[in-house]
Amino acid sequence: MLKIGPYEFSSRLLLGTGKYPSLDVQKEAVEASGAEILTFAVRRMNIFSPEQPNFLEQLDLSKYKLLPNTAGAKTAEEAVRIARLAKASGLCDMIKVEVIGCDKTLLPDPVETLKAAEMLLEEGFIVLPYTSDDVVLARRLQELGCHAVMPGASPIGSGQGIINPLNLSFIIEQATVPVIVDAGIGGPADAVLAMELGADGVLLNTAVSGAADPVKMAKAMKLAIEAGRLGYEAGRIPKKRYASASSPMEGMSVV
């Protein structure tokens, strides 16, 4: 089970809801993924305009926990304002803190992220900050009281996969809260690797919404994350420099 704050989830896949070809495809992909946590950008949602269509109308919200994010924020203060807006909607008490420090790379601003997380924790939010693969920053965020840390595998939407598995492994080793790999996942192999490293979950969006067949890719990601977690729990064999026969010669009869 994936435990975030007071909540428990069977699925370790967190799915973004943006950039799908249509609301119908989005709905099918969400269902195929088996995800129980759905994230969305508050600034792109018409949560206070019921006359305008949005993905919430397509879903049975009793099956999902919503994770609004503060995408578009450049400062801690902006992130806090967006989070308060999401909370005022009555849909959720979790927030993914996203404070971007560079428009070209969409990498997070570490100083503003830390500041926003602290402010939101003081207001009683369940805080999940998007961060880089900076090992020290991840530790600072968990020490602050964040309910999970979400290090990026590579830049948002780049599909480059896990660029620095060593840093991610360091973050996971020191973690006292769930580690959810976020951003840059391109295909099922990337998701498997994240889980084999020991991550507690994976958040992805473009890898599914941008696929030629989003519904099939959503199912593939579901299976990849399950396989990666099983592999991690099973314990892979150590790598060796030389071969080791699976059928040793000892005890074999001479023909």
Curated annotation (Swiss-Prot):
Its EC number is 2.8.1.10. The keyword Protein biosynthesis does not apply. InterPro entries: Aldolase_TIM, Thiazole_synthase_ThiG, ThiG. It is found in: Cytoplasm. The keyword Cytoplasm applies. Transmembrane segments: none annotated. Gene3D superfamilies: Aldolase class I (3.20.20.70). 1-deoxy-D-xylulose 5-phosphate binds at residues 157, 183-184, 205-206. GO terms for molecular function: thiazole synthase activity. It holds the Pfam family ThiG. It comes from the Bacteria. The active site is at 96 (schiff-base intermediate with dxp). CDD domains: ThiG. SUPFAM superfamilies: ThiG-like. Its main location: cytoplasm. It catalyses: [ThiS sulfur-carrier protein]-C-terminal-Gly-aminoethanethioate + 2-iminoacetate + 1-deoxy-D-xylulose 5-phosphate = [ThiS sulfur-carrier protein]-C-terminal Gly-Gly + 2-[(2R,5Z)-2-carboxy-4-methylthiazol-5(2H)-ylidene]ethyl phosphate + 2 H2O + H(+). GO terms for biological process: thiamine diphosphate biosynthetic process. Keywords: Cytoplasm, Schiff base, Thiamine biosynthesis, Transferase. Pathway: Cofactor biosynthesis; thiamine diphosphate biosynthesis. HAMAP family: ThiG. Catalyzes the rearrangement of 1-deoxy-D-xylulose 5-phosphate (DXP) to produce the thiazole phosphate moiety of thiamine. Sulfur is provided by the thiocarboxylate moiety of the carrier protein ThiS. In vitro, sulfur can be provided by H(2)S. Belongs to the ThiG family. Homotetramer. Forms heterodimers with either ThiH or ThiS. This is Thiazole synthase. It comes from Geobacillus thermodenitrificans (strain NG80-2).
